[in-house]
Amino acid sequence: MAQKINKWRHTHMSEKQFMLLLSVPTGFLAGLSAIIIKKLAHYIRDYFYNIATHDDHYGLLFFILPAIGILLTIIFCRYFLKRDVGHGIPGILYAIQKNKGAVKPYNTFASIITSSLTVGFGGSVGLEGPSVSTGSAIGSNIGQLLRLNQKNIVVLIGMGCAAALASIFQAPITGIIFAIEVFMIDISMASLIPII
């Protein structure tokens, strides 16, 4: 499939146009993943803390619930995922520097589940890192699926990062600046336009 798409692309559009075209599904999927992370974490939090506020041991549950969230995250990683989720933004930076931008496919969904459980049960972590990691993993995997070169994969990582941050903070300029500052090695108009 990737060969057919690449063959069609080479005959019908330039590389810049193709990257601009890829910005739509990459941005949509990365933004959607950030919304899913946020909504799922808030749903879990609202559900369990609503139960906790109606319990006689109200204060004790606020210590127990985060431990349950961490335990569920460990169980998911150990028995279902059977590997470490990764290290968020540093993991993406490592993939850019050492793996030609290749992020493992499981990173597109693992942080959605683990961060939603941890934060939803009251763990003291934020949703920004997992959102950036998931959005970047989506961009990387789209690039790998289409067998793009490292430069274009890094641009797709930047697209995913910017879209995820823009979605979770509802601040698109912040997402763009963060993606350029943290992930983009080569800043040119050809790589900047699709991120915007």
Residue ranges and their predicted role:
Residues 1-196:
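Alpha-helical transmembrane segments and immediately membrane-proximal extracytoplasmic
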